[in-house]
Structure formats: structure tokens, C-alpha cells
Amino acid sequence: MDIQVMEEFQGIFATILPNEFTMSRLPAALAHECNHNIRFQHIKWRNDITLAEMMITEGLAENFAVLQYGIENMGPWVSKVSMEELEDYIKPIIKEGLFLKGLDNITAYLYGDDIAREKGYFPVGLPFCAGYACGYYMVKYYLEKTGEDIASATVKPAEEIMGKIEDFWS
């Protein structure tokens, strides 16, 4: 489907492999995707989106899903990353790429090296969906620090969120 049709459709496409594991997590996955739909009704999608903006978008969606359906239904792109791995390994690499623009430049940071290589992009030394995991914890940090609720944060520009969490990176 070309970009113009996608913009007119304003939807989200997903593939689900039906089995006991995926079906039990379907409500949380749908909540995650619905959060994206809500956000992009208020924040215009741009093809030159920064890594920071994408991480906030994914972090908002996963925090919303966890708030609705519990931590036990957190996506494996977050739950499989330990805090030690996040702090010692992932955050320092991602911090260097926060303001890169465009999916071709941010794919490895967001999805990890394996997917980047598969798509023909350069690897940066990150595991599967490292940017999703970091985005989840970045937004969680923001919500806890500010006391803001997920609904109002979902429609807030990424720059405003980033401006309040500079200490997340130290």
C-alpha cells in the first residue's frame, strides 16, 4: 500500500499468529495500537520523525497497554530487557542517536540490529527492539516524575516530554 493511501486510511495494520500466547495478549496489543491511533490524531506523522519521538510514541503505547491490562501482559519487546542491560548497554548507545531523523536512520536503534540488517540498514550494536524497551522506561520515568496521566501525555508533543526527562539519561 503506498504512503498516500496509508495517510488517507489512517489505520494500523497488524499480523497476528493465533495461538494461546498471542490470543491471551491480544487486548494489550490492541490497546497499544489504539494509543498510536489516538496520538496520531493529535500529533501529525512525519517521515522525518526522530528516534526520540518514535521512542516516546512506542513508550506511551506500551505504558498505556500495561496500565490497562497489567505488567503480566507487557510486550516481550520490553519484558525481555533487564534493567542492567538497559542502563549499562542500551541507553548509552541510544542516547547518541536520539535526534537522528527518518526511519532509515533510526531503525537499528528502535528495532535492533537483526531487523536493521534485514531491511538493509546499518547495525548500531543493539538487541531486538531496544528502542521500544528504552522508550517504555523513558515514558514511565516521565509519568512518575511529573505525575501526569497517560491520556494527557499521549497527546503531548515529544519535545515537551523530552524537556522534562533530561536526567533519565544520566
Language-model segment annotations:
Residues 19-23, 27, 31, 66-74, ...:
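Secondary-structure boundary elements
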Residues 28-41, 58, 62:
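Active-site recognition of the HExxH zinc-binding catalytic motif
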